[in-house]
């Protein structure tokens, strides 16, 4: 049967025969750098682009009329692309300014409901890997208490729907609609959007004064162009489009009864696979795990939320932000971390991950050496944990990470490693053995054939490390003033103001990550950016007495910000040269000019706390320094 490869949240799935350096998939390990293309443009790919969850969202005649009303309205004050945590936070923070009403906002998403990554990802074992008390947005505002320290996928998805209900956003959402292009009309001071409806609605034209790209960092599932992929006769799917018709079960009750007599192969051992493998081990007749680079897996220690303890946690105003920033400090500013570790998880015992997200003092002499020493000790403990749990020493060696901990996002799970003790689980090590290829009945590595009834391709997502523009990551062709394509600006030496807006793309906002702050808790980052963007938009409206206006950074301001980003990066990016898998940066492979351009495309390397201080200081001045604001006639 045809592979059940599905489209991403903007209609694409990633299959490509060439890597970034121009080598073919056969010349390199194809799990490294496959790039996305739209398989929906091919006849054979059309069946793979379906939303596997759309049938759960019944569309009444009233709902259809509401959607048609939003389209007929045509012009909207604010267009938000994306209905995940980012889109919700941008909408809520705009409403809280008092300068925007609910009818000013239009949210567009290809999904049939709210949730973003938690809408699409519904694989068995799905949970967040950051404490839910700081990861789930707007808990203080909603008063909701998470059921567990690490919330499940269904709970996270339900929370997104809850937020949309409390703020009345559902009636302002245009679902099952993919924005394909955004074009700036300078004469009208508006963004013109071309969208493709995926249900009864077909091509849609929209207009907006402001546009916000909030499609997330990991919106696009990535599948390498494995040789022979299209010849395989069994079902193939990505975890982000889990096919329960093949496995049995549901997201809420993932009892995969249809796998009891099946040979299952899962390719990849990243964050998704770490959660999936224990579930497959329980339900499959035979499970084969294909690994290129092992994940560093520490314990998670999940538990149910104690109500009495929750009352203590959520008892004071501002508690969630305080807890978020306490968590951030233990990773991004370890030398000045508070006396009390509020979260107390395994993330907060990994300050060396600051080499990825940035930290106070990261460019100072000796910082990298100090982090390498700390990381070496931690990685040694991770390897010891593998050998303590996995009975077979040779298998334990294969599962042990031998690279700096900042090279690959760490994982946390209590059952993953133990799954490799089960007699029905095999581990296939791909290191030094060439690439995977598909046969009609399974997979092949070098001269060895692996028969499989089902293949799950857990090869991750298009990463922000790819240094592409917000438009490219969202699969939207964005064209600014004078026909300037956003991708061209990113390639030719990026400049932004605060990582959220860029000149010649007026009234357009995006949540970094280039030239903005980042942290391991993406919800905190998104909330800070949403607050900042809401402030800029509201102040611009106020300055123009509520009239239509255009706002963008001055050339000098965004150049100065880019220079600050480069200055704060220093030589910190060289830490990634030791990474064995695809890295953010490798000095050995880049010219001096390329290194400088990479530095402009990186994040605020001084850490999220420093970045937020910069934003708050800028806002406290109240002058909107560096912005050009013009009222339209």
UniProtKB/Swiss-Prot annotation:
Its cofactor is FAD. It holds the Pfam family NAD_binding_8. The lineage of its organism: Eukaryota, Fungi, Dikarya, Ascomycota, Pezizomycotina. It comes from Emericella variicolor. The record marks 409 as: Transition state stabilizer. Transmembrane segments: none annotated. FAD binds at residues 117-120, 129-130, 135. Pathway: Secondary metabolite biosynthesis; terpenoid biosynthesis. It comes from the Eukaryota. Keywords: FAD, Flavoprotein, NADP, Oxidoreductase. Its EC number is 1.14.13.-. FAD-binding monooxygenase; part of the gene cluster that mediates the biosynthesis of anditomin, a fungal meroterpenoid. The first step of the pathway is the synthesis of 3,5-dimethylorsellinic acid (DMOA) by the polyketide synthase andM. DMOA is then converted to the phthalide compound 5,7-dihydroxy-4,6-dimethylphthalide (DHDMP) by the cytochrome P450 monooxygenase andK, which is further prenylated by the prenyltransferase andD to yield farnesyl-DHDMP. Further epoxidation by the FAD-dependent monooxygenase andE leads to epoxyfarnesyl-DHDMP. Disruption phenotype: Impairs the synthesis of anditomin but accumulates andiconin. This is FAD-binding monooxygenase andJ.
